[in-house]
Amino acid sequence: MEQPEDMASLSEFDSLAGSIPATKVEITVSCRNLLDKDMFSKSDPLCVMYTQGMENKQWREFGRTEVIDNTLNPDFVRKFIVDYFFEEKQNLRFDLYDVDSKSPDLSKHDFLGQAFCTLGEIVGSPGSRLEKPLTIGAFSLNSRTGKPMPAVSNGGVPGKKCGTIILSAEELSNCRDVATMQFCANKLDKKDFFGKSDPFLVFYRSNEDGTFTICHKTEVMKNTLNPVWQTFSIPVRALCNGDYDRTIKVEVYDWDRDGSHDFIGEFTTSYRELARGQSQFNIYEVVNPKKKMKKKKYVNSGTVTLLSFAVESECTFLDYIKGGTQINFTVAIDFTASNGNPSQSTSLHYMSPYQLNAYALALTAVGEIIQHYDSDKMFPALGFGAKLPPDGRVSHEFPLNGNQENPSCCGIDGILEAYHRSLRTVQLYGPTNFAPVVTHVARNAAAVQDGSQYSVLLIITDGVISDMAQTKEAIVNAAKLPMSIIIVGVGQAEFDAMVELDGDDVRISSRGKLAERDIVQFVPFRDYVDRTGNHVLSMARLARDVLAEIPDQLVSYMKAQGIRPRPPPAAPTHSPSQSPARTPPASPLHTHI
């Protein structure tokens, strides 16, 4: 047996969550009717893109397009390639300049206008194509030159027309590829005293900083030194993040029941090598570096052979969004008495003039991201567990805006306004029943199952669920519909029942029937409370954790129903007067992160 340093614990291999990087999208920039700053010709525009740090909110230059001479309607060739995270608010800023010299110093060029948006706004627009007016923000003086410079605030001069910016997002093709492969091994080292080894493979993707991230683990083959593992599939972006020459490290272990797996050896390869398929290039010597150092006659600890390799493109979340799939967002808020009297500062519903309460923080964190995937920005908002005026009837499915026919509110601000108004008119009561609001959203989801709509229900609650059996049944029934459920637990209650509904460990069932999909994600709000008061950062983490599973849940539903993405809508054509004076096409240029 090897020394303890050649052993690995089981936990090292089982945490694969979050190992798949975001997909990459390519942003193309065009402008129409820019300001004309040149006396005897048209402007020579350049676009600069900035990203914003989540922690310090500082704008950082991401990249620049090329300069296009003598046009007010540029179609820039150089693209911006960025990582896309559905679950994050990725703020972007685009500044336009009229270039007057070869100087890279932007202060030496005329400012033409700017636009702010999020990456989600671009992706979620029809056809993933967003048009925004350019504005000239407030100016400040450059401390070195004294020349006016645009401030980074989102201010604008009322009535000042600076033209339009057109932003298009396209998912990179290699981000949708899925590789399917199979391996076998020969003459692996024997690690067990009373039998042969129980080998398995662990695959790692190399990172920019030289570290490695686990991305796949095969099954264990019992009692053999010549295993043939099952075929497996993995997204190419998980294997190499789209870089075909990036190192892929594969470690070979002998499985042990107590979790102290014995290291047999390792080898490295790359996606480009694997893509050659079965050949002499894909027979790898398994080497144990420690044995190689200690033993002069050491050759290897066996070989691993690639038996087959194939790659195909799969439909992705962005394919469906670009094809017009709308995400319908509904929020349901807990109005039970366990929240405490809203007029007292100890209440979870207390409305402080200085900061948002937990309900409003959670709603805003999730809503401000998901809102960009719904074109009309009208969101149903429900309450449960309250007595309603005028007769004190208890309801577990009432509209926050008071409109029984149409519970939709305009934007996230509209939901917050209706929520605050409800706190002043209803009486907190109980019990904590989820089934009515789950059934409400499921009913709407069932009405449209052609792939054009997908519903997301956000439930924010403080208490122990009262109708567990009914809620389980409602979720099992909803799992076959185009919908997902997010539950955020606020306050200090025990949320064991919510963890059960989450179904990450054990898929929930009702009356002996298993849910077809895992559609519930639960997080306790207290895990995201920042003691320093930095709610921006902590709520960004909350949104990331509860929204991260939505894209895969949407795609899993579409696949199960055999629904393919629709073709994206055609981009509007511009009148001849707006046609750009195009620069001759050049070979594609890209700006990477």
UniProtKB/Swiss-Prot annotation:
Residues involved in Ca(2+) 1 binding: D38, D44, D98, D100
Positions that bind Ca(2+) 2: D38, D98, D100, D110
Annotated Ca(2+) 5 binding sites: D192, D254, D256, D262
Cofactor section: Ca(2+)
Protein name listed in UniProt: Copine-5
Molecular function via GO: calcium-dependent phospholipid binding; metal ion binding
Chain ranges of the C2 domain: 2-134, 161-284
Organism phylogeny: Eukaryota, Metazoa, Chordata, Craniata, Vertebrata
Cofactor detail note: Binds 3 Ca(2+) ions per C2 domain.
